[in-house]
Amino acid sequence: FDSIICATDSELYAEIAKYYGAEVPFLRSSEISEDKSPDIDWVAWILNELIDKGRSYDIFSILRPTSPFRLPSTIQRAWKAFCEEPDADSLRAVEKCKQHPGKMWIIQGKRMFPLLPFTNNYTPWHSSQYASLPEIYSQDASLEIAKSHIALEQNTIAGESIIPFISEGLEGFDI
């Protein structure tokens, strides 16, 4: 990495990040730091703040502190995979779902409805054998790599061409 920048609204976390060698050029505002704030809000904000300070990056990565079992080799594997696909907009860490969403339900009042009303040869997914359902992956939020212009121009971190990075073992475990 050219730079390691911590994006936080916490002075305590900023001090910890600085202690371990990260830059904290500014603190995030509370408006983009709420529990339900979309990531794109703070990502676009920090990229624009850096541009205003004369620092621009073609590519950025999000490494969340809540993934403590992600290793340097994990990041190296992901970077290699991203570099091998120059037309991709981003790379996102995923893991195979342990519970298939085709077997999930939404409860409304005294009734429930399938979350995903898909069928497999006219059999609803919720009534199909697991082996007959497509493999489904869930993002584990441990690692993302993306092109800066995608975040700044399309209001999305992922873009449309996304490389799956399948986490191994506890790499994607979120605490």
Language-model segment annotations:
Residues 1, 55-57, 85-88:
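Short, high-confidence coil segments that cap the C-terminus of an alpha-helix
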Residues 1-5, 89, 170-171:
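Short active-site oxyanion
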Residues 5, 11-61, 69-80:
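Short phosphate-binding loop-to-helix
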Residues 41, 68-160:
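Conserved core of the sugar-phosphate nucleotidyltransferase
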Residues 163-166, 173-174:
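Conserved active-site beta-strand element of glycosyltransferases/polysaccharide synthases
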